[in-house]
Amino acid sequence: MEIDPNYVNPKYSSLKSTVMNSEVLTSKYKSAIHHAGDGELEDDILAVMEELHSMLQEKGLACHTENLEVFSSTILHLKTTGQENRAGDLIAAILSFGCSISAQAIVPSTLLKTMSEMLDSFATRNHELKLITKDLQEVVPRQVLKAKKKSKAKSAEGPSASTEDIKDSDTKGNQDIGDNGDLNSSINQRNREICYKHYTTDEFEALSLEKRQEIMKYYIQYILGAWGYNATDPTKTAMLYDLIDKHTVITVMRQSKEGTLTSDDILMAIDEVIDSVNSMSSCYGGYKATIGNDNGTPYLVLIPKEGVILLSYPPPIPVTHHYYNKALSFIFPCAITIFSSPIYI
């Protein structure tokens, strides 16, 4: 028996159309999204589904909720991977295909077979795109978040700023600049949360809290060379834990264990932290990060806004990169505990 895609349970039939659209259809769409395993992108996919549904209605076309979810998740994936033109082409193709099918009045069985094949193809391509995106995330350097400066208020006589003008552009890495005078301001709290989520990874988050803290303390002191690091200071702790890229942490720690860590690798890791601190330290009180050098060994230097070096000074004994690579577990026993984790096997 064929089911009308626009069928609404009788108990909702007395509701106004606007209410039904916002309550009944939204509930159906969310159910389809979670059934497809895309719950983490619920809000984004839901917005595309509603927009595509509106376009189909304008053409007098109907689409089953499950099919609409597949189309919408594919369109969203194309948009988020920078393929806006292809997403537009896909929408146009869906509308054109629907209109041509309607005009030709194909018998239901043939239409069902055609749509099923099309749906299978979309599902396959969408899965392939997700795998490609995951691989790219592993090899492409993580984008450094940037703090955007506050613009001056526009004149009352001039054109007013539109919503799009003042809207945060998180996907481009631009955040409202922090308030150095108030670490607990809403802007600073929001930006710190964004920074943490941006620079962490699923693999790192899967570790226990104790293991994560142990790894980060070791990385900060012995890889970045921050020998003066004070782990009891919550502000410095939060800034370094948030702004250090956890993908780099895991990669470098594995290289250390395998004896393949080079001076260039350490220099790149320090430069990466310098970029992120100089971009977003305003929401941690304001610091300037730079690089120091002790007999050819680079180390991280953090200078607070007062101008006094607070963290990271030359280590008390000469440290060579051969020392980092070959004598790691012997000189620093904590490395043995860290590297015993299953993720480093």
From Swiss-Prot:
Basic and acidic residues composition bias: residue spans: 164-173
Keywords: Viral matrix protein, Virion
UniProt-recorded Gene Ontology molecular function terms: structural constituent of virion
Region Disordered, residue ranges: 148-185
Superkingdom, natural source: Viruses
Cellular localization per UniProt: Virion
Gene Ontology CC terms: virion component
Name of the protein: Matrix protein
